[in-house]
Amino acid sequence: MIIRSPEPEVKILVDRDPVKTSFEEWARPGHFSRTIAKGPETTTWIWNLHADAHDFDSHTSDLEEISRKVFSAHFGQLSIIFLWLSGMYFHGARFSNYEAWLSDPTHIGPSAQVVWPIVGQEILNGDVGGGFRGIQITSGFFQIWRASGITSELQLYCTAIGALVFAGLMLFAGWFHYHKAAPKLAWFQDVESMLNHHLAGLLGLGSLSWAGHQVHVSLPINQFLDAGVDPKEIPLPHEFILNRDLLAQLYPSFAEGATPFFTLNWSKYAEFLTFRGGLDPVTGGLWLTDIAHHHLAIAILFLIAGHMYRTNWGIGHGLKDILEAHKGPFTGQGHKGLYEILTTSWHAQLSLNLAMLGSLTIVVAHHMYSMPPYPYLAIDYGTQLSLFTHHMWIGGFLIVGAAAHAAIFMVRDYDPTTRYNDLLDRVLRHRDAIISHLNWACIFLGFHSFGLYIHNDTMSALGRPQDMFSDTAIQLQPIFAQWVQNTHALAPGATAPGATTSTSLTWGGGDLIAVGGKVALLPIPLGTADFLVHHIHAFTIHVTVLILLKGVLFARSSRLIPDKANLGFRFPCDGPGRGGTCQVSAWDHVFLGLFWMYNAISVVIFHFSWKMQSDVWGSISDQGVVTHITGGNFAQSSITINGWLRDFLWAQASQVIQSYGSSLSAYGLFFLGAHFVWAFSLMFLFSGRGYWQELIESIVWAHNKLKVAPATQPRALSIVQGRAVGVTHYLLGGIATTWAFFLARIIAVG
């Protein structure tokens, strides 16, 4: 650690009134670009307007100005998020059965949307129990509201109004920090101060406030709710906060206040800061006292982490020093120069953040079902399936975004003259080895994983079940996964002596937990069927990575096109007269990567949906007999391609296909409509620009004949635009089809 002399106290970090607020400017489409601001000559203008409106790099090359625009746009984004949240809470307050659900969450479904009768749409208002008719929601809001101690619709109203106020504040902040007091570039590049605020402030104090809220408000209210007290009889949140005796009745150690904390007698707090593990048998969720303890611990960690870096006081680590000291045996100059890259290229910074956040989102998807955090979440199968699917898709998109911005960084921000023999340079120098090895891995995984299925389909067709790979014939048990499960199941009392239960029931060993006659969670068995589909996961993930990584590593140059960097991030082909150079731009790799990402995530959510219905979700009789939704058919049916088509896609589509005339009929229409949107994409993906230009010209001729030709000349979409429209409809159509299929099925049978 280097101790430097303290820097001068006051730095002026903002410019006052740098950009005047002008409504005339806002009213002029394309004011950010000289060409676009001239107005439309051809229909391509509207596409360029949309493509470049938020591409701040194309407006100016001044990094400070770009940074200010991005910063201001973030406030706009936060404003939209607050507005959306406000809408969710408002629906809970105005149109929902939240109070009824709170009184009986096992028999009443959550609903926060009631359809108005105009021409018969009121059929969509299904009976969700307790005499309430509405659309069943699967977002998990009811469960999170209960966990946070909300007991009335009035509280939801107040929160909704609060969120609206915050949305307004964010809009104001976005305007203020661009037009009135805009930060200087030095402020955006002061990473140590940023770490201090983000780690200690956002994550540290944020977690601490949440832990405080949980201890003082959520825990006592949930204890009353679990005991069956009527929500209207429970004291209001502020009474718990202001009146310590009220809490001391539930948790006697509260009477001692902060004394145990300062006398280091912390075990006194073990009543409400627990380390139980497992699930609460009443609600089927994690113990809320465990969650409070967790957030307190996280807060301490991040408060410490936020104070490790050198800010105005001359003590602590400098990030540049840390990075430059980081040299491995094979990495040459190591991370030298990385500090400069990450403080001058926001694309590089964003790429890292997207990769991390995308991975984290996928981790969240897997924990939401294996360690369900909110009360009664585990028995709401529709919500469980929705949350898993949602977080998987979001994670997939964020990871593709990481590759996109890494490639933009390579094209726009990377300076090969100043980067010599550092980590990135070394990776680029042996990119051929990386890509060819990855390609080999993809071929190996593809042939072997698919080959196992094809073998099974063939043996099945020939009537030779004894020659199939299955749990009852030739076993391919996932022994490593089973070993991991077993290690975790046996951890309490062994490798984790402090824990009473393993982290998740899914590991095995423990009993099942049932709430209101429905299975919340039980040990999940893994067998040959899972071994097969996991290798399909490995295959699709590796192909996605191959496409995206090739796009990044060859973004600036390749043997085929040595001067690729000059052509930019997106271009259709390397100019006229050079055949075989189409689909080589970095943008095209993102385009192709999106399809494989869609492929990969689809297999994951199909696997999850079927596995849970077959081996986990179901009802339990008074005698303790579990009946699963699809009766455990996953292990024998999913080992052939035909089984996936017949027993998953076809068998489980019956609910969405037969939904007409029921409250689920909207899903039937979405299922049809989204198939149409998906098919529509193929028109853009399978036809060339020339075909459409030719067609347009004869249509324009007809308009001229009738003297109704427009002043703006119609043009066919460019090649890149056509691909963009195509992939968008492909993904949206595919995702909405899956959504309708999943929800109609799980709401009908779950």
Swiss-Prot record:
Its EC number is 1.97.1.12. It is an enzyme of class 1 (oxidoreductase). Keywords: 4Fe-4S, Chlorophyll, Chloroplast, Chromophore, Electron transport, Iron, Iron-sulfur, Magnesium, Membrane, Metal-binding, Oxidoreductase, Photosynthesis, Photosystem I, Plastid, Thylakoid, Transmembrane, Transmembrane helix, Transport. The chain crosses the membrane at residues 70-93, 156-179, 195-219, 291-309, 346-369, 385-411, 433-455, 531-549, 589-610, 664-686, 724-744. Pfam families: PsaA_PsaB. GO terms for cellular component: chloroplast thylakoid membrane; photosystem I. It catalyses: reduced [plastocyanin] + hnu + oxidized [2Fe-2S]-[ferredoxin] = oxidized [plastocyanin] + reduced [2Fe-2S]-[ferredoxin]. Phylloquinone binds at residue 692. It is found in: Plastid, Chloroplast thylakoid membrane. P700 is a chlorophyll a/chlorophyll a' dimer, A0 is one or more chlorophyll a, A1 is one or both phylloquinones and FX is a shared 4Fe-4S iron-sulfur center. Its main location: plastid. It is a multi-pass membrane protein. One of its GO terms (biological process) is photosynthesis. [4Fe-4S] cluster binds at residues 573, 582. Chlorophyll a binds at residues 683, 691. GO terms for molecular function: 4 iron, 4 sulfur cluster binding; chlorophyll binding; electron transfer activity; magnesium ion binding; oxidoreductase activity. Chlorophyll a' binds at residue 675. PsaA and PsaB bind P700, the primary electron donor of photosystem I (PSI), as well as the electron acceptors A0, A1 and FX. PSI is a plastocyanin-ferredoxin oxidoreductase, converting photonic excitation into a charge separation, which transfers an electron from the donor P700 chlorophyll pair to the spectroscopically characterized acceptors A0, A1, FX, FA and FB in turn. Oxidized P700 is reduced on the lumenal side of the thylakoid membrane by plastocyanin. Belongs to the PsaA/PsaB family. HAMAP family: PSI_PsaA (MF_00458). The PsaA/B heterodimer binds the P700 chlorophyll special pair and subsequent electron acceptors. PSI consists of a core antenna complex that captures photons, and an electron transfer chain that converts photonic excitation into a charge separation. The eukaryotic PSI reaction center is composed of at least 11 subunits. NCBIfam families: psaA (TIGR01335). This is Photosystem I P700 chlorophyll a apoprotein A1. It comes from Drimys granadensis.
